[in-house]
Structure formats: C-alpha cells, structure tokens
Swiss-Prot record:
It holds the Pfam family BACK. Kelch repeats lie at residues 351-396, 397-443, 444-490, 492-539, 541-586, 588-634. The keyword Repeat applies. The lineage of its organism: Eukaryota, Metazoa, Ecdysozoa, Arthropoda, Hexapoda. This is Ring canal kelch homolog. One of its GO terms (molecular function) is actin binding. It comes from Anopheles stephensi. PANTHER family: KELCH PROTEIN, RING CANAL KELCH PROTEIN. GO terms for cellular component: cytoplasm; cytoskeleton. InterPro entries: BACK, BTB/POZ_dom, Kelch-typ_b-propeller, Kelch_1, SKP1/BTB/POZ_sf. Residues 100-166 form the BTB domain.
Length: 1499
C-alpha cells in the first residue's frame, strides 16, 4: 500500500512535467512504480511539488483577477481568524477522536482531547502534562469533577463558549476552580451575583468562601447586610451556626430600621432549637445593641422574654439598656459601650424616585427605579393627584411642594417617608404655586416663582424645618413660571422660565444669596428655555432641554460659576421639556417630560467625562411630564413596608388582645383572615372597604369559612373597587325558609351575621306575604305566590343602625381594597392547593415582624361562596363563563359540568391577560366536585373609562352590568332573566302616541319624526324578547320610581288574585310571573305595576293562568335608552320622545298606543318585525346618556354613608347569534330544565355543539354556555327568583346544585328609597369621586312654569378609571364631520330647539374620545386673559378661531403653526391640540389648559 507522501509525490511530478491527461495518468503510474522502486529522492519530490505549484499559480494569476477584491499584501501577513479556524478544526477532530492523545475520565465518562490544547488554556493541565507522571499516560482519571461540568469545560477550551445556568453554575464553578479556568469561574461568580436574593444569599456566601471567590464573597456579605430584615425570615438563617450568627449581627453595617429586628432574629434562632442553642444566648446578646431599643419595647417584650429571664448575663444587658434610657442628654454620650454605638450602614443602594406628574392627567402614582437591579416598581401613592410640583429631599424625607391637582393650583405640601412607605402632610406655603422651582439650601427648602392660577410669580419663600414654617424671602426681578433651580456653592440659581408680563420664554438667570437675601442677574443662556430641567455636577450647573414656545429643545447648556459663562454640551437623544433632572454619582439623570407630541417614559443619563448621553434599558410604566424626581436610599423591603407599618399601627390601636386587624389589605393573609374572622365579628370589626362604602355596612367576612349561610346573599365583583357585600342585610323571603332562610321580623339584622349563627327563617309566612322587617316596603314581594312562596324582588339593606357607625371606622377590609385610590394595598390571591401559595400574603409572626406581601396586583378571584365543609373546597368557587364561549376558552380550560364543577372564565378575562381577568381556580378532586356552584354570572368589566372598547356588539345587545357594586342584569341574559333590548328597523304609525320632547319639556302635541331621529324612545324597544317581560332590567333602571312601592300580596294558595304594587316594577313582574310560578298546583295571581312611564307587555305565569300587566305614570323618569333606529316613511308620523323625561306608554294590550298586540297566553308580542328580532344599534351617546342619567343615580345614595361613589362595570356581548331565534314567536310551549337550557346534553337531538371544544384536565368535554334551541324556548323572567321548594318544570336545577348553592347564586336587584333622581340635584367631586348636593338651575317649560332640571351631563372618557360630569348642555350625538373649535365654543351656549322635530340639536362623533370627552371651553369663552403657563407652549391664541384638521390638530383659520408642545392632559398636547401661536408671543401650560376642549381644571 502506498503512503500518503508517495501518492502525493507522483501527482506533483506529473503536474510539473506539464503533460496532458493521458500522460499524467501514465506518468502517475510510472511515478508510482518509481516510487515503489525507490528511485526518486525526497529532495526532488519537494522540488517537483514547488515547481508544479508555482507554475499553476503563475498561470492562474495572469488570467484571473482576485475574486475577493483585496489588495495584494507585501511583507508580513496576518490572518485574524486563523486561530478561530484552527480551534474549530481541532474541535472537529476531537469530536471525531482524531489525533487525540489523552482521554479524560470523570465518574466513568470518557472525554477525548489533545494534550497540547488543554495545556495551552489551563495551568492545571500544563503542569500535569509537562512535569508529572500523567504526561506519559494517555488515560487520566479526574477525581471530584462532575462529568457534565468537565464536558462543558473541555468544549469551552476548544470553542471559547460556555452557557452558565441555574442548573449547572454550582458544578461548573467547582470544576473551573479546580482546573484553574479562571475566566469561567469569574463568569459563574457574576451569574451568582445576579441571582442573589434573601433566601439564598447566605448559602452563596458560604459557597464563595469555600472556593475562594473573594469578589462574590464580599458582594454577598454586602447584600446580606443591606437586606438583613429579609434574610432572617428564611430557613438559611435558622441553619447558621452560633459563630456565623454572631459574625453577622455584630456588623456595624447592618441595615435595619430598628434594633428590634436584630433582637427578634436572635430569639427566633434560639427558639428554633432551644435545648441545643440556649447556652449561646448570652454570647449572641452581647452583639445586640439593647440600649438602642425603645424603652417601651424593653419593658413590654425584652424584659418579659422567658429566655432572657433565665440567663443572668442577659439580665445585666437589660439593666444596662434601662440605665441608658434613664440618662439625660449629654450623659448618654459619655455612656460608651459597643452596644450604645448606632449601626451605620454604608453603601445603601440608590433608587430614582418619580412622583406624580401628568400622564396625561394629574396622577397620584409614584415609581422607583432600582439602579442596581435596573427595574421599576410602585410605591405608596400620594394622597391627592399632583403634577407641576417641586420636589426636595430634606433629611430622610421627600417633600412634594405645591403643584396642580387637576383643578386647582395648590400650596399644600406632602411628605413621603421611604422607610415607612407612606405619605403625610406638612405646612402649607404662603402662596399657591405650580410649575415652581424647588431646591434645598442650608437645610431649608426654597420655593421659587411659579404660577398661582392667574399670574406668574416672582416671589419666593423658604421653609425652616426647625420652626416648621414658611416665610417669604426677597422676590426676583422677573416673574418666572416653569423655572428651573439649582444650588452651587451655597447660592441658589433660577434658570429661564416664562414671563407672563412679556409673554416670552426667558434666557435670563438670577442668583440668590441667602446671607444677604438678594437676587443678582448673571450671564444669560444662549437660548430661551422654559420648562428646562436643572441639575448640578461638580459645581457645574446644567440646563437641560426646555422649550421656546412651540419649539422643544434637546440641547443642553452648562454654566461655570467661576467664569460666569455658559457653554453647549452634547445634545440629548430626544427633545424634552418639563422633565425631571437629578444628579447622582457623577451622572445626570433626565426623567420623562414630553417632546411636544406625547409624554415620554424614557430616562436619559449624561456622562460629563465622555460628553455623551445614553438611555436607561428600562422605562417608566407610563409617560410622565411635570413629574418630581429625586434620588434616595433604597427603602428597606419597599414592597412590604406599607403593610408592616400598617400592621403595627392597627395592632396598637384596634386590637389590644394581640390579634392584628390591619387597615390595609396587604397586611392580612388568607389564613389570618380565616382564623380571625369570627373574632373580628364578635368584636364588632367588619369588613367594609373604607374607600367605597356605598351600600351600608357589611359584617360578613370576605374570607370566613364558617359564616352563616344566607340564601339571598348578593355577591358582586368590581375590578377597580372593593367588593361590597351587603348579604346579611338583605330582605327575607316567603315560604318555609329552607336554604333561603330570612331574618325574623323585628330582629337586629346584624345579630346572626355578627355572631356567626345560623339565620332562622320566618315560619309559615302566608302566600305572597311580604317580609317587612327588611324589605317589605323597599321592594315588594311578588303577589299571588303559591305554597312555595316567591322571593321578594328589590330587597335592599336598611340604613345601618346608629350603634354601628362607630364600628364602621374599625371595619377590617381583609382582602379587597380600591386599587384606584390605594395602590399600596396588596391582595390575597388564593391559587391552587393548598391555600398558601407564592402569591399569597403571609402573616407577620408578631407585632414587629414582617409579613410577606409580595403580590401588589389586584385579583378578586377569591373565595366568595364558601360552600364546602373543608378548607380546600372553600378556597375557590368556580366562575361561570359568559356568552362568548369562543374567547379564551382553551386557555382557561373548563371543568365538565356533569362532574359537579364548572370552571368558566369570563367574557373579557383575557383582555389584558392579568390575574384579575383570569379564572385561576384550583381543580378539586372528583369526590369534591359536587360542591361546585351554578348561579348567576360573575361579571367583570372595565369601568366607564373603558366603555368605548366594548361597543363592538354586532347587534347592539347590552348583556350585563355590575353597577356600583350591585349586580344588575340588562339585556341578553340567555338565562331566562329577560331578553335583550330591542331596536326596531321601523316603527308603525300606531306607536305615535309617545310624548315628543322639546327643549323646554314635554310637548303637548305630536310632531313628525325626521328620518334621522337619534334620540326617540320606542317603547317596543324595551320589551323583552323572552315573553315580553323586562322587569329585571326595569327594576334596575327605575329604582327611583319603584322605591316607594309597598307589598300587598293577598293571593290564596290555590288561585292567586291580583296584587297591585304601586310604583314597584319588580313586585308587579314577580306578581304575575314569579308569583304564579311559585304556586304549587295552583294558579298564579295577576299582578300589576306602575312602571314609571314605561309599559311592559303581559307575562304569563309558568304554572298558572295569571298575567302581569302594567300601566304608566306619565312624565316619570324611566330607564329608556335613546337609540338610533332606521325609520320607515310611516314612522315619521311618530313624535320624538324625551330620553330624560320618559315616555307615555299605552294603556291597553290590544296593540294601540305604540304597543303591538300581545297574546297574553303566550306572553309574546304579535308584531312580526319585533318577534323576528330585527334590531338596530345602541349608539355610544345614547349609552352614555343612560349611564349618567339613569344608571348612575340608581347606585348613588342620598345619605352620608353613601357619599362614596363606585365605578360602573359592564360588558357587552360581541355576538348574539340567537337574537333572531329568541324572538317572542316561539312562546313557551316547551319547557326545558334549566340545565338543558344552559348547557345542553349529548342526547338532545337539537343540541348545537360549541364552535370549539377542548378537553378538560379530566379528559372530558365541558358543556359550553352557548345559545341553543332550548334558550330560545325559555320565556320566563327572573330565573334567579324562582321558588326553591318544588320548582315548576323548566325552572329547577335538579341534579346540578343544591338549593343552598342556588340561593347563593341569586342576583337580587335592590331598590332605592323614595326620592328624586340624585344626579339631577347632586354634583360630582373630581378629587375624591363623590357626589355632593348641588343646586339645579330652573329651566322654563313650554307652559312658562319653571322646573328644576339640570342640563344633561356627559361621561368623560379617561384612563385612570374615574370619570366626571360637567353641567353642559351637551347634545346626545354629534353631526358627521370633523368637530372644530367653533362648534365646541357653541356648546357653551344654550342649545336651540330643533324646529323640525322639537328636540335638542344633536351631533355624533365616530371617535370614542369625542363621544366621551367633556367639550368645555369655559375658560376661553370667559373673555379673560389666558393662563400664562399655557401661553408659553404655543396653544390656541385669541388671534383666530382654531379648527381641528384630519390628524386631530387644531389649526387657525389664517395661520397654522405646528405645535410640538406639551402632551400633558391639562395642555393641548394630549389631544395634539396645536393651535396657532402669534408671532410675538407663545402660550404657557395653564393658558392652553383653559382653552382645551376637555378642560376640567378651570378655577
């Protein structure tokens, strides 16, 4: 066999002779023969190879150019990737086991390698292969090395890449340290530094100490000292040795709020193993600085500790501490021991604190940026909204001075304590100031310039913390609003700003000398800057950004006091004005601001050494302009301080017995709430949320497992507010008690709930008898009920007894807080089994211990229906799914209904994919699934501020509304409660008797209705498609007229008689429907109700012959929704009606007066158009009108306990595919059990399967709640109020749930006390979201009589979950086309009646923001001078009327100038309000604010 060299020799010699292919082949053979014979020498081979290759290279170079275009190199040649290619080739050979000369073995795993490669990268292998016995071995076994780590390290040697993960970091660091691969070891140490947390830092420190990782060891020790309070809560601390504990607690650098934490951790460590550790107590207490404890703590806790009493040395330490407290003043300084020296932590991490600002409205939220961890987190909110304030850090407190709260310029001062994570108030300034400058000089706070709401200020004042007072100092020479201030060398500088007198942005700068109390002019900046940020680095003053009218700057100037000159430095990445600036560690941080178009959430950092800017990797959660910025020490346990402090305060003030009842929800854990619920009730501590006490007191604990059952318990959810549970105070019911046990007449409504006793029901109430002790006069019980008895509709709790008012202040909101108003509150989030989980709050172990409250987001998906016997069953009750079963179905898998538990997620639970929208219930074992609940839907909505996002219903059906905490059902229920609100394509001429509505009141004659009638109310639109009954919705909509109803049920058990319930909608409906249904074998009585101006068709009793009729009370306010209906020519004869004054309803059931003929036996209207479900669409202005004028008053009380206002919650059905099939023409011939209607069954021939079905965790398929043929046949209303004992066919839940569970699922609709519409006489307070009584202007009617009726109000769409109303004569809709400034000015005038139809002129906008924005220009129309703050930013001037172009900007009639001004909510920029700026002046923030369409800040 030829060798490789011989084979190559023959080829090269043939190529060198230059012969053809034939000769080459022959020569090759001869060469091989020659080589074989040994006739050719080695030297000639080399020569031949060289000659042949040289000839090839020369010929190819002459004919072909260089393909890569590189220049020919001369001299030394260097290939930068040669080493990389070489190692890649060697790694490939290693993987193929080529030329490997050593095999490394670890735990039986063999890894081939090359000695030369290993020795070149590792000193360990270099020594092994050069001077030891292993150099002559080809198989080496490594002891104590993990084979996975060895494989990774060998690959790193060849590839220079290794991935460090949580799984391999420990073995990798150990092996790298042994093999002396220091770079890999350092990479592992860096990774461990990033993974440090209080639960593992002690172990990582020991690990670093063992392996000699000095940097990691020091870093871990610093971390432990800075997070000592958190570290001692974990098991690693309890497993330390006594020497390790002593080494830790003797450090002077421990960061602890008080020495109590050190003392408590020592006691805890001893108690972990008392017998084995008690003898270490004295040596550990030597390092505890007991003299630094408070005297009360020493006496109450330390001296009484049994461990301390049993040790003589510890007693000496206590005596020493008490002596220290007896010393006076300077005597303490002479008493020097190691235990009297305070700890001095160093190197505390810094956080960037951002307070308030505009986003786009004035907000309360406060964010912190951790510079080390590079992440943002929320801390306690300010007490009130605040922007344009000044911020100062004095001592360890942060002062927010002055500013703007959304309506007023304020002079108040709020103080933030980072340690306690709470806000307090301080002394007010002498003057109101917004856009002021604030700085700290000589331990005093200076407030300079600003704007007081009418003029710019040149005055300044100083706050002396020793005297706790503000006093005026010398005034500046120029008025300056939006001024920046800074302190250099003990002097205060006021930089730029805006002068309202000259209406110019300023370039001038003044300097204040506190020793002489004088201001001096210094060199001006090179550019005019208003709203510039000012910071100081190394005695250099920096002016950052700002604007000159509409021109927003990104340039920066620096002032050197030594030379009195300004110079330009590097520009920022973005144009910014009104940004916060703070200096830290030689860097300048610029936070937020706006670029003239939108608010900015980014943060830029300036380095003076490189004269460059960089952007922080993490941005704020929202863009903020006019925010206050400060750099402070990182608060200890920032997320938990609020809970800890609140726990201590509550502990001291509320429960001397030792049980902690916190005023903050994030202090109470689930277990704590369960264990203390009974004790809290017995002590008189309830659970009502202090932020939303809208419906009276509630002593029923939210988390109690042993609460007394209450059949009529109304449970409701509200995303943004707390859950209001008034269950123990609702009305009783007729019948024999059962699961719906009521409270005996004349008894204290709180007696049984507070004492946690069962609630006995009244014995043997007669048929249809009202339970007057609680609900008899507030909501009528359906008359004519048979033996079963009908549940009273409309029961609400009575006013709380006077004795409970004192208890109200001590109520304990265990789980639910108002996220809008209290972001410091945490929320229990029970998830899975067992109840304690990561997201759940952990209770503190003592009055000074820290509870773990890591979850600060809202999750109301918790225990509401505790129905099981075990705690596991009571952790979670399933949430039922809404109509849109195709949405998020697979994501939240459902349990099969047939197994006893239905886990349905809500319609919009995945809107934002937050826990508050998710069904996170645990899946109970099969044996416990019978505890599942099947009742009403849990409706989660989004609040008024988000209404526009749900107006996408294809048929305009409104499904469910949770109004102010009460659960109201309106529209398409698919559960038999009622039909949806119907919109007719055309109206017949027979419906022309509806009262037209003019500008001054109801008209006396009918007028033709124009084609585009956007506000007429058709009575037929509100008749239910399910049997013509809409009592449930009308009961919710018209409580004001139904509140004064009384019950008069007198039907016998056999055949019910008519029950007349004046003014009560629910009673009348229940009288004919539910009352008849309640009879057992008898015939239901006939009920009637006066429905406040709204007629209802007859409803048939399910098991009887009675019917419910309704008459009208003309002129009463109803719940009618104004709609846009497509009119036919015949319908133009019908006069329009008043959306606010109600309609005149027909008096007959024969089809006249606007009602179609009704078949009483079937309970369905005979109008084929109506029966077929031809519908239009509920317009946004109409829905807006309904919210403000109808639903809002129903849930706003008229007594002081009800002042608190709760957000609306609602949602819409996106697709109602059963509207046409659910028409009244189907009648009620076929009765189906409710379970078949809701879920269907496999054996039902007409069951329509869902569009998508997914198996549950048990492998079965759930029955999705979906429109089925059975739903179309269900005609009765008020399903929730049917009798429980012996229900009629089609209404029971046989085989699905127990009566108790059904009772808990009921959704009562409480009535209101008699009285006028609160919204007509009350005004909305924007600051605290409450209603206050207000005067109503007198408006003349057509007859000349004055009536008190306020102008229509409008809900404004905002993003913070609140809403306001303005007293504007706002039309229901806007005309098509762009809305201009002129049209908005016209809104300030009283609208003229439409001569054509006698109604108010209306306009409609296609944009949601226009529909829900308050169109107010009161400030500009007043004729006064514009605000100076707003003038400076280039808003609309009085030189011309602006208009809004296609892009949303406002431009002038003759002049257009693009405004790149502020995007704040009080300024024009949040709506891109770009008005024309005059050439001689610019607009300030507050002047633009007065001219904004949605201005709510005018004073």
């Amino acid at each position: 066999m030829l060798s490789f060299i011989q084979y190559t020799l023959g080829i090269m010699s043939s190529l060198g002779n230059g012969n053809n292919q034939h000769n080459i082949n022959s020569n090759t053979g001869s060469s091989q023969n020659s080589a074989a014979e040994g006739t050719m020498e080695r030297g000639s081979c080399i020569l031949v190879r060289y000659a042949s290759q040289n000839s090839l290279d020369e010929s190819s170079q002459k004919q072909l150019p260089r393909s890569n275009g590189k220049e020919k190199t001369t001299g030394a040649y260097r290939n930068n990737i040669h080493t990389q290619r070489s190692f890649e080739a060697m790694n490939m050979m290693r993987e193929q086991n080529l030329l490997c000369d050593v095999v490394l073995v670890a735990e039986g795993i063999e890894i081939p390698a090359h000695k030369m490669v290993l020795a070149s990268c590792s000193p360990y292998f270099y020594a092994m292969f050069t001077g030891f016995e292993e150099s002559r071995q080809d198989r080496i076994t490594l002891q104590g090395v993990d084979p996975r780590a060895l494989q990774l390290l060998i690959e790193y040697v060849y590839r220079a890449v290794v991935e460090v993960t949580e799984d391999n970091v420990q073995i990798l660091l150990t092996a790298a340290n042994l093999l002396q691969l220091t770079d890999v070891r350092d990479a592992c140490c860096d990774y461990l530094q990033t993974q440090l947390d209080p639960s593992n830092c002690l172990g990582i420190r020991d690990f670093a100490d063992i392996h000699g990782c000095i940097d990691l060891l020091n870093y871990a020790e610093t971390y432990i000292e800075q997070h000592f309070s958190e570290v001692v809560q974990f098991d690693e601390f309890l497993n330390l040795t006594s020497d390790q504990v002593a080494h830790l607690i003797k450090s002077d650098r421990l960061s602890v709020p008080t020495e109590e934490k050190v003392y408590e951790c020592v006691i805890t460590w001893i108690q972990y193993d008392v017998n084995g550790r008690q003898h270490h107590l004295a040596e550990l207490m030597e390092h505890v600085r007991l003299p630094l404890l408070s005297q009360d703590y020493l006496v109450q806790y330390v001296e009484k500790e049994q461990l301390m009493k049993g040790d003589l040395q510890c007693k000496d330490y206590i005596i020493e501490a008490l002596k220290y407290h007896l010393l006076k003043g300077e005597q303490k300084t002479c008493f020097k021991t190691p235990r009297t020296i305070p700890r001095q932590p160093v190197g505390l991490p810094k956080v960037l604190l951002v307070i308030g600002g505009q986003a786009p409205k004035a907000i309360r939220s406060v964010e912190c940026y951790d510079l080390r961890e590079e992440k943002w987190y929320q801390v306690a909110e300010m007490p009130t909204r605040r922007c344009r304030a000044g911020l100062a850090v004095l001592g360890d407190k942060v002062y927010a001075v002055g500013g703007f709260n959304g309506s007023l310029r304020v002079k108040t001062v709020d103080v933030y304590d980072p340690v306690l994570d709470q806000w307090t108030t301080s002394h007010n300034m002498e003057a109101r100031r917004s856009t002021l400058g604030v700085a700290v000089l000589n331990n005093c706070i200076y407030a300079v310039g600003g704007f007081d709401g009418s003029t710019g200020l040149s005055s300044a004042e100083m706050f002396d913390p020793k005297r706790q007072e503000w006093r005026l100092i010398a005034s500046m020479s120029t008025r300056r609003s939006s001024v920046g201030v800074g302190v250099v060398n003990g002097l205060l500088y006021a930089v730029g700003g805006y002068d309202g007198a000259s209406r110019q942005c300023l370039a001038s700068v003044e300097r204040y000398n506190p020793s002489t109390d004088t201001w001096t002019q210094i060199a001006e900046m090179s550019a005019r800057r208003s709203g510039a940020g000012v910071g100081v680095l190394d005695n250099i003053l920096y002016a950052v950004g700002g604007h000159d009218g509409p021109l927003v700057r990104k340039s920066v100037e620096a002032y050197d006091p030594a030379t009195n000159t300004w110079r330009a430095v590097g520009d920022m990445a973005f144009c910014r004005r009104n940004a916060g600036v703070v200096a830290h560690n030689g860097m300048l941080y610029v936070v937020g601001g706006d670029d003239g178009l939108s608010n900015l959430a980014s943060v830029e950092v300036y380095s003076p050494e490189s004269d460059s800017w960089r952007i922080l990797p993490s941005s704020m959660s929202i863009g903020r302009s006019y925010a206050g910025v400060a750099m402070i020490d990182k608060p200890l346990u920032s997320e938990q301080q609020g809970a800890r402090v609140a726990t201590k305060q509550s502990y001291a003030s509320h429960h001397p017995t030792g049980t902690i009842y916190s005023r903050y929800a994030n202090c109470a854990a689930l277990q704590q709430a369960q264990n203390e619920a009974a004790a809290g009730q017995a002590a008189g501590f309830g659970n009502d949320d202090e932020n939303s006490q809208a419906e009276g007191l509630n002593p029923e604990p939210a988390n109690s497992n042993n609460s007394a059952p209450n059949g009529n318990n109304v449970h409701y959810e509200n995303i943004y507010e707390s859950i209001e549970q008034f269950a123990p105070l609702n009305g009783g019911n007729g019948g024999n008690g059962g699961a719906h046990a009521g409270i005996p007449a004349g008894s204290n409504p709180l007696q049984y709930a507070v004492l946690n006793q069962p609630q006995p029901g009244p014995s043997g109430l007669g048929p249809g008898q009202a339970h007057r002790s609680l609900g008899g006069e507030r909501g009528a019980v359906g008359g004519g009920g048979g033996g079963g008895g009908a549940v009273g509709g409309g029961c609400i709790p009575p006013p709380p007894p006077s004795m409970l008012h004192s208890m109200q202040q001590l109520y304990h909101p265990m789980a639910y807080r108002n996220e809008l108003y209290d972001r410091t509150a945490g929320y229990d989030v029970p998830r899975g089994r067992p109840a304690p989980s990561y997201y759940q709050n952990q209770p503190p172990t003592g009055p000074s211990a820290n509870g773990r409250c890591p979850n600060l987001h809202l999750d109301l998906n918790r225990v509401r229906y505790p129905s099981g016997a075990s705690a596991q069953q009571q952790q979670r009750t399933p949430r039922q799914r809404s109509f849109d079963d195709t949405e998020s179905y697979h994501y939240y898998r459902c349990q099969n209904q047939s197994n006893g538990t239905a886990k349905y997620d809500n319609l919009y639970e995945r809107v934002r994919e937050e826990p508050a929208y998710q069904n996170t219930g645990s899946f109970a074992p099969a044996a416990n699934r019978a505890a599942g609940l099947f009742g009403r839907f849990d409706v989660i909505g989004h609040g008024v501020g988000r209404i526009e996002r749900h107006l996408s219903s294809s048929c305009g059906n409104i499904d469910h509304y949770s109004l102010g905490g009460h659960y109201a059902v309106l529209g398409h229920s698919h559960l038999g409660t009622m039909g949806h609100i119907r919109l007719n394509q055309s109206n017949s001429s027979s419906a022309s008797s509806a009262s037209p509505y003019g500008a001054n009141g109801p008209a006396t004659t009918s007028q033709p209705n124009p084609t585009k009638d956007s506000s007429s109310v058709n009575v037929k639109s509100f008749l239910s498609c399910l049997g013509g009954e809409n009592s449930q919705s009308m009961n919710n909509l018209n409580k004001s007229s139904a509140a004064h109803g009384t019950a008069s049920g007198s039907a016998p058990a056999a055949n019910g008689n008519e029950a007349t319930l004046p003014g009560s909608i629910s009673g009348g409906a229940s009288g004919g429907g539910a009352g008849g249904a309640g009879s057992s074998g008898g015939n239901g009585g006939q009920g009637s109700s006066i429905m406040g101006g709204l007629a209802s068709a007859a409803a048939v009793g399910v098991n009887g012959t009675g019917a419910s009729t309704s008459t009208t009370l003309g002129g009463k306010s109803t719940g009618a929704i104004p709609k846009i209906s497509r009119k036919s020519k015949q319908s133009q004869q019908q006069g329009p009606s008043d959306p606010t004054a109600g309609t005149s309803a027909p008096q007959s059931l024969a089809g006249g007066n606007g009602l179609p003929p009704v078949d009483v036996s079937l309970g369905a209207p005979a109008d084929p158009m109506y029966a077929n479900g031809c519908g239009g669409r509920v317009t946004k202005p109409s829905l807006q009108w309904l919210l403000v004028n109808k639903w809002l008053p129903l849930w706003v009380g008229q007594t002081p306990p009800d002042y608190k206002f709760i957000d609306f919650n609602f949602m819409f059905s996106r697709n109602c595919d059963g509207c046409s099939s659910a028409g009244g023409s189907h009648g009620q011939q076929q009765q189906q059990p409710q379970e078949l209607v809701r879920y269907g069954t496999i054996d039902q021939a007409d069951y329509i399967p869902p569009a998508r079905e997914y198996p549950t965790m048990t492998g079965s398929y759930p029955r999705v709640l979906r429109n089925t043929p059975q739903l179309a046949r269900l005609r009765e209303h008020e399903y929730e109020n049917v009798p429980l004992n012996d229900p009629p066919p089609g209404r029971g839940l046989r085989g699905i749930a127990s009566p108790l569970q059904v009772g808990r699922a009921r959704s009562e609709s409480p009535s209101r006390p008699p009285g006028s519409d609160p919204l007509r006489t009350w005004a909305f307070d924007f600051e605290n979201n409450t209603f206050r009584p207000a005067r109503s202007p007198a408006l003349a009617t057509s007859s000349g009589l004055a009536i008190n009726r306020e102008k229509p109000r409008e809900v404004r769409r905002i993003t913070d979950g609140t809403f306001g109303a303005r007293d504007l004569a706002q039309p229901d809709t806007e005309k098509p086309g762009p809305s201009g400034l002129a049209s908005k000015l016209a809104l300030l005038k009283q609208p003229e009646p439409d001569k054509e139809d006698g109604r108010l002129s209306s306009a409609s906008s296609s944009s949601d923001s226009d529909n829900f924005a308050i169109e107010s220009l009161a400030a500009e129309s007043s004729g006064g001078q514009p605000d100076e703050e707003e003038e400076e930013e280039g808003g609309s001037t009085r030189s011309g009327v602006g208009r809004r172009d296609d892009g949303g900007r406002v431009v002038g009639n003759s002049t257009e100038k693009e405004n790149v001004g502020s995007s704040s909510n009080e300024t024009s920029d949040s709506l891109n309000y770009d008005g024309p700026a005059s050439a001689d002046r610019s607009l300030s923030e507050d002047e633009v604010e007065a001219a904004r369409p949605d201005n709510t800040a005018s004073e």
